[in-house]
Amino acid sequence: MSIKLEISFSKSAKLNGGLAILLKTAEADSAAGAETVDPAGVIVKAARIARYSAKSMNGLDIVVPEGAPVDRIVVIGLGKAAELTAHDWLKAGGAAASRIKNTDKAAVFIDVPGLTTSPRAAADFALGMLLRAYSFDTYKTKKGDEEEKPAKSVKVTIVTADPAGAKKAFSDSEAIAGGVNLARDLVNEPPNVLGPVEFAAKAKELEKLGVEVEILTEREMRRLGMGALLGVAQGSVRPPRLAVMQWKGGKGKDRPVAFIGKGVVFDTGGISIKPAAGMEDMKGDMGGAAAVTGLMHVLASRKAAVNAVGIIGLVENMPDGNAQRPGDIVTSMSGQTIEVINTDAEGRLVLCDALWYCNDRFKPQFMINLATLTGAIIVALGNVHAGLFSNDDQLSAQLTAAGLSSNEKLWRMPLGRDYDKLIDSKFADMKNTGGRQAGSITAAHFLKRFVQDTPWAHLDIAGTAMGSPQDEINQSWGSGFGVRLLDELVRAHYES
């Protein structure tokens, strides 16, 4: 289970056992808090013996002598002070959280000599701790020997010069951690537990935070003409849902910003069935919907001054006797017809109806959709960047900047008529795949046909939402990618 960190901020710490974590830059002669924790100079001696250099996120564990005010000391290196970024403070917090074992209290000293630590940096450090403390072991019945188990709850005191400022900044950090970890939970849940109905129920729980949530049933979607989404769902005994979440934190007359997520709770590929190897990972094919749900959690928790809409299309793609076939032609809510070439190109069929519904009903300032849409984007970008496709240069630039700020990086991909014509169909208005070439681009062009003139961006997060490389702030298979990115976008550009 995740370790619960009870984080507080103070100008000083009462030391009586437990763990002390001290930060140190490469240039500083001593670490933050050394005069309080280590009057005997053990740290300096240990660092000299170990040839410790305080490189970025490099740790040094020190067993303290009897009579010391703490049981254990850990020094975390920050690297060169001049090169520190906001993300480095997150990483430092994650590195610190990874060292919290078999203790129920920890004091963290972050005001390094010669370095001004802002309240925002202190809050980022704490956010890094919360993100790293997450784990998903709900279904493990054997969790190691008792002596190896970490404490379920750890009281963490972060010692800094401006505790009031840090506490104020941290209120947003707690909201962000809650949203990211909610998204991680949703992606990590097994598919027999989290179906479309169950996912919709999770979205409904956001009402406790003040989010207005509507759940559209299959009958309601059929009445609206969502033939593309329903075509994907017809092969499963589990009924589809469309969850519509609204956070009304802005002015009443302000048009909302809108986020749409692909929520294929399990994707076999349908009749165009996937290979068996790795199919278990397709429980994460709802990573876009998870990110949108996590984002709405953040916006509501921190009372964001914005009107926001989150819409998630929830289906299961299965190959039963009633499943959609290659060659079928379906009619989308827009009235445009689609020839189904490959039933494993199903996410775009879900999204096209959700996008049209969102645009038609809410007339948003922009629409951003997130989807684990194509394997082609992983071939192009790997697990480092998500693919960004957009019809609007300003929105694209804002997203790119938010990606750099949050370290949830995006790379803009091309669009153009030469790609768009690859999805023209002989028998319908379009087909749902253009073949192997430029697969992520033709998928984006398919979605573009359903947004009209509204500023729009498509984030293909197939390489970043699940199974991405673990790092200082994420040790989870489901990363929660997109939550911090989009919160940063809203915070920087769209709050009144």
From Swiss-Prot:
Keyword Acetylation recorded: no
Location(s), subcellular: Cytoplasm
Top EC class of this enzyme: hydrolase
Cofactor names: Mn(2+)
Listed name of the protein: Probable cytosol aminopeptidase
Textual note on the cofactor: Binds 2 manganese ions per subunit.
Enzyme Commission code: 3.4.11.1, 3.4.11.10
Molecular function GO labels: manganese ion binding; metalloaminopeptidase activity
Function (record text): Presumably involved in the processing and regular turnover of intracellular proteins. Catalyzes the removal of unsubstituted N-terminal amino acids from various peptides.
Taxonomic lineage of the native organism: Bacteria, Pseudomonadati, Pseudomonadota, Alphaproteobacteria, Hyphomicrobiales
Residues bound to Mn(2+) 2: K262, D267, D285, E346
Family: Belongs to the peptidase M17 family.
Catalytic site: K274, R348
Pfam families, A to Z: Peptidase_M17, Peptidase_M17_N
Keyword list, A-Z: Aminopeptidase, Cytoplasm, Hydrolase, Manganese, Metal-binding, Protease
Binding site for Mn(2+) 1: D267, D344, E346
CDD domains: Peptidase_M17
Keyword Cell membrane: no
Matches recorded under InterPro entries: Leucine_aapep/pepB, Macro_dom-like, Peptidase_M17_C, Peptidase_M17_leu_NH2_pept, Peptidase_M17_N
Catalysis performed (reactions): Release of an N-terminal amino acid, Xaa-|-Yaa-, in which Xaa is preferably Leu, but may be other amino acids including Pro although not Arg or Lys, and Yaa may be Pro. Amino acid amides and methyl esters are also readily hydrolyzed, but rates on arylamides are exceedingly low; Release of an N-terminal amino acid, preferentially leucine, but not glutamic or aspartic acids
Example of a GO cellular component annotation carried by this entry: cytoplasm
GO biological process: proteolysis
Main subcellular location of this protein, as a coarse class: cytoplasm
